[in-house]
């Protein structure tokens, strides 16, 4: 079971392992957050795993502790294994605070795998460091696969990862504050556009907007919209098809403030005509 919108790789990862991905759609009207009732409706006797991503890429949606706990409890009660992708865990905006499923893993170590890395929260994309917290038996299996596929992380990256995780988080907090400021600026602008639905993201550095009400003969879908925006506005956006949400486009605000606002002004002129 994969709540949708989802990161593009999730379905293919399931296919590569011989499984069948089942997308559980959460619309913009729900803030792109799936409910227990929706998960229950999608459940089949063959279901084995729930993939849970919060904060989310592409939507920036962040489940509250109570929302998360309700979903975790449901999944455990239904006998599902939970894979929690928490790669954006430190990029959560006030009044929310980072909160990990690790609190549940301590109780159910054989039913949960927490997946994380340093690329996003620590801006260490080039160091290629990821890690998993799960049961030791599963760690052995994962090590066997990794050892024959990509090899281990180089020692320099490992040292850098230890320094990042054990050192002061001042730089992470500064980055989080900068992203929150940009989120506020970008969302205020996009939310003012007629016929565009864009929930206010609560984490990561994305906004995900439903633009289906803007479709016409020249722009029949989100992919056509992104092609037009690249051509006419010089702005690259990502259509929602690959994320399981074909009527949406993803905005990233991981750029300088002036670049962000200039880009949004260009997008507005093309989409809204103002």
Residues covered by each model-derived region:
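PLP-dependent class I/II
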Residues: 1-274
């Amino acid at each position: 079971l994969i709540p949708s919108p989802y990161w593009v790789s999730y379905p293919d990862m399931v296919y590569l392992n011989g499984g069948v991905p089942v997308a559980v759609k959460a619309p913009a009207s729900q803030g792109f957050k799936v409910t227990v009732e929706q998960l229950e409706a999608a459940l089949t006797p063959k279901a084995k795993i729930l993939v849970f991503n919060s904060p989310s890429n592409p939507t920036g949606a962040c489940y509250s502790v109570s929302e998360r706990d309700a979903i975790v409890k449901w999944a455990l009660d239904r006998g599902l294994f939970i894979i929690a992708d928490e790669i954006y865990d430190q990029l959560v905006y006030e009044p929310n605070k980072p909160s990990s499923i690790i609190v549940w893993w301590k109780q159910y170590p054989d039913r949960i795998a927490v997946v994380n890395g340093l690329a996003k929260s620590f801006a260490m994309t080039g160091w290629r460091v990821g890690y998993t917290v799960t049961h030791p038996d599963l760690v052995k299996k994962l090590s066997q696969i990794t050892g024959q596929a990509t090899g281990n992380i180089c020692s320099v990256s490992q040292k850098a990862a230890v320094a990042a995780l054990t050192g002061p988080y001042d730089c992470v907090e500064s980055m989080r504050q900068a992203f929150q400021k940009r989120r506020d600026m970008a969302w205020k602008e996009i939310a003012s556009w007629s016929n565009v639905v864009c929930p206010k993201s609560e984490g990561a550095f994305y906004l995900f907007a439903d633009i289906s009400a803007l479709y016409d003969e020249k722009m029949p879908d989100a992919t056509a919209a992104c092609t037009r925006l690249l051509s006419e506005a010089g702005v690259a956006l990502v259509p929602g098809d690959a994320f399981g949400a074909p009527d949406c486009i993803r905005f990233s605000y991981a750029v300088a403030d002036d670049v962000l606002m200039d880009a949004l002004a260009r997008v507005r002129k093309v989409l809204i005509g103002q």
